Amino acid sequence: MPLPELLAPAGGFDAAVAAFQYGADAVYAGLDRFSARAEAQNLSPERLAVLLAHARSLTPPRKVYCTFNTLLLDAEIPAALETLDGLDDLGVDGVIIQDWGLFELARRHFPRLQLHASTQMAAHSREGVRALAARGFTRVVLARELTLDEIASTVRDRAAEIEIFIHGALCYSTSGICLFSSHAVGRSGNRGRCAYCCRDRLTEVGKPDAAAGHPYSMRDLAWLPHIPALVAAGVASLKIEGRMKSPLYVAAITDLYRRAIDGTLTPADEARKIADIQTIFSRPWTSFYAEGTGADPLAIIDPSAVGHRGTRIGTVQSVLRDGRGGRWLRFRTARALEKHDGLQVEPAAGGQPAGFAVNALRRCGATRDEISLPAGSDVEVELPPDLPASPASGAAIYCSASQAVRRSYPIETVRESSLAPLHACAVTVTLEAAGLVVTAEATDSCPDTATVRIPVELTPARNPGQTEAAVRKAFDRTRDAGWRVARLEVHDPDARYAPPSLLNDARRRVLEALTAARAAHRQAARNEALAHSTLSLDSPSAAVSERTHKEHTEPLFTAKVHVLQAPSEGLNDADELVVQIGLADDETVRRGLAAWLTVVPRDRIRLALPLLVRDSESAPLDTRLRALAADGWRHWECADIAGLDRLRRCVAQAEDITADWSLYALNRAASDFLCEQGITRRVTSPEDTEANLTLCADVGMIEALVFQLTPLFISQTPPCTGSGDPPSGSVAFADRRGQTLHTCSLDGRWITTGGRPFSCADAIPGLQRLGIRHFRCDWSWQPSDPTVLTAAWRAVRCGETPSGSHSANFRRGLL
């Protein structure tokens, strides 16, 4: 069985070099723009070209994938097209994508690019992978929440290559649908600007004696023990997270997993290398849901502290004072220590560790400083004078930086001058009596050619046997022109002589002409793509029901609720009621719908599918949909592309299908894609802005989200409360500013909403002037008091923002 690809992070050029040096088969790197790690070092197009050349110079050649996994605003489409064109020109081995608009542009205008579906697309099942593969993705990065059995089942399905994360940081929310950072501070995790709000320190509401903690702060994923199972399952690519990490970290973690995949990692080596890695960067590790979804939340979340901890090396015995008033930490070290290493001492009661450098080191009881001391030594380390409190006896001590580890992973320097250019061409040189004719043709998929004719009398050669060698020597010097000659043919039927100066001039001129031809060809392609992307979309399909698309001068208001929610008479004037059926059983769904039918008639009700569906939940949901279709339900809403395919399969009589906000369409290209898929109307994202909606409003299929109890987190994992036990059904937390978060269990997931709902209802008149007629209020993510719900509904219908709400990014903009 072939081994899987080991895919390492490359936050910068040096990290990529380190990854290749220590065994990565491929790296993934972001550019200066449009990367889900916008604050990583990232690469310029020029440095990406050098990295590609380096990767292809290695034996065997390695691969470079480019991350383009952010959501695009409409104004960014021209720059995105230029970036796609550059990636296509460089010939990257794959592009990792989240945005459906970007996918549409790449598929239509740059068909040579291999497209990989980012984990931000939240593929949770075989059907999710099938749906992505059916649209043209060749590889899918699965959601991290899957079990080993689910991964193996997805691989066996063979719909696309499967890539999974095996190590690194975890988001509390399912990747791609986290809105916390965006709503809290305008920094979208879907655009690479996450503010890591899930690491915040919070206090449980209603528990005055509970200590503050980090109830949503995840441990780091570490699937080292499961590598044999993943190899046996046939996973195509095993991916390490870490584009924000140092080259040293990348070297060490890549080396560890390379040895594990190859089967050369001994137990002793494993323990030593893990400890070394922990000195570079490490939170506590977790296997997450590898062995099933019933894992203990405390084995997944670390509520006591955040950030780098190190490797455990000892326990505080005491703190001594010297004659100068200095304080010395006494302990027995489990690993060798040397000056300038880093230590962290963890408070016995929890909380953030105290970190400091080893600036003075000595044996216990000695007065002479040492440069280093071996493992097993009883040592004393001087504490920094600015450390506010002395560590208590019994506190754990960690080594958080090691000079020895730094020396263990030297990173080579790439000799860039020795790298061959990326672009290859075939050259034909013809010597004639009347002059020299040189033709160069690009050998990649772009059919660019150039011919140069130099009229000059070529005399007979004195040594015709040396002519071809002279031509080859001249055309060997192409690096500065950005081309390498992959094939050279010399035609010299009359044995003519061409001086070296003429050959060099011909080389320069033909390669300049070929470069110009390539630039013109690519500019024309960009212009065509840009012209297409800026065309306004046609009106939605005429097949859409008359009730949805007849002309209205007044706004049409939609309310979305959950089938488990108690009906509210206040919604009886909704132009449309969307009922989320979730993953409730058949009888619960029937009872819930019957209750809502007492408020709104059937012809004004649309049924909505849940957002995340695992394989184990798929068959019961299909059965339920077929039963509902048989009952005559014709109007539906999907939340992802797999849901659209599910409806096509199970509800053939669907008269129209709309898309909820989670099928992101923040640009007209994405709306174009959804329209092409048969979507009749799409709900705007809770992240969207007024300026962006102004550009997108002409697509004619928009339903503006103007009120929502927004799901800031959607997670498989319950938060960890102060008691350490998962909440029984719901729990609330408050930050130091008094802002509250509410987390409840819904459909087997944990949904976190803020204390204040999102609303931009006061913008309805302006949005109407843009041509938008449909407006939505969404209560489907959290139970809502009927009185509060009715008051908010009435305010929104009057174009007023409900009391206590916030407008998120709508006016402040989105990073």
Residues of each region from the PLM?
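Active-site pocket-lining/capping segments in soluble small-molecule metabolic enzymes
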Residues: 1-123, 141-146, 150-237, 244-396, ...
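Short, conserved phosphate-binding/catalytic loop or strand-edge motifs used
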Residues: 127
